[in-house]
């Protein structure tokens, strides 16, 4: 009886865990580079990157609050430090008052060399209204001579209600070996 109960309990937990998120693989030129787990309720799509149509960008929105996220490969860079220059340039292009809120620091994500940074600024929305965003950026060396970027931009409310999912999103980035 106990074994049957434990089996049902374990099966139920597995069903809940598998329904709670979806792992997505990022590939470039048909070569898988890394995976990232999208939390339950986050809507996402894969499309050509507007700044580099030869690569794709997986992006979307969270289910609660104003939260946008994206992952892609930074064009023509081989290190996180080179990619960081790209972040600074791109941030100033999209968000004219962009500023760092926390000094960038080096670390790792699941065995990959990484650089973390946090920013804030005002961005025009599609409806023309201005919106203040906080952005978290993780640059990571995929081990294939490419650097991936994961970005999450959110308003204050989005940061509060999606905090755990945002943290899980960044921690889930893994190389494909």
Predicted features and spans:
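Bacterial N-terminal signal peptides that target proteins for export
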Residues: 1-7
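Bacterial N-terminal signal peptides
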Residues: 7-16
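Boundary of Sec targeting at the N-terminus
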Residues: 20-22
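Stable alpha-helical elements in mature extracytoplasmic
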Residues: 34, 38, 82-90, 162-169
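Secretory pathway targeting signatures of secreted, lumenal, and periplasmic proteins
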Residues: 35-85
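Surface-exposed amphipathic alpha-helical segments
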Residues: 42, 145-177
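Short, solvent-exposed aromatic-acidic interface loops
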Residues: 74-76, 90, 152-158
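Signature of long, low-cysteine stretches enriched in small and polar/charged residues
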Residues: 88-141
